[in-house]
Amino acid sequence: MTRYLLDSSALWRIMRDGSLAGAWREVAADGDIRSCYPQRAEFLTSARNLDQYEQFRVLFEEIYEDVAIPKSASHWIGRVQLRAAEKGAHRALSAVDLQICATAAHHGLVVLHDDADFVTVEGLAGELRQRNVRQGPL
């Protein structure tokens, strides 16, 4: 069974595209899509008002189980940033994306996204697996 760690780009795509929502519905209902605090914080900032903020917050509580950021994340991120800098790709990787990647790699989860930066990180860190939400579940 494949378990995923959610990036905000994937969640937005799922929420806006009915066919993708259908493709991922069973995986989400089975609890196989997880979330981590930096991703939730990033996503919650997109709420237009308090009502939408509460809707998003409940979505995370009820559907996307929390995955803890590992204590070793800073070391993993530092290694990946150095590899990215050596290839001139370090400016493309946000702090939130790197934390999501470090968490997914640590817990053996596949990053679920709609953002090419995760493909870049996978090329820099062989232990990271990623999946574009448009490709459907593995």
Residues of each region from the PLM?
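Short active-site oxyanion
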Residues: 1, 30-33, 62-65, 105-110
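Active-site neighborhoods of divalent-metal-dependent phosphate/nucleic-acid chemistry enzymes
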Residues: 65-112
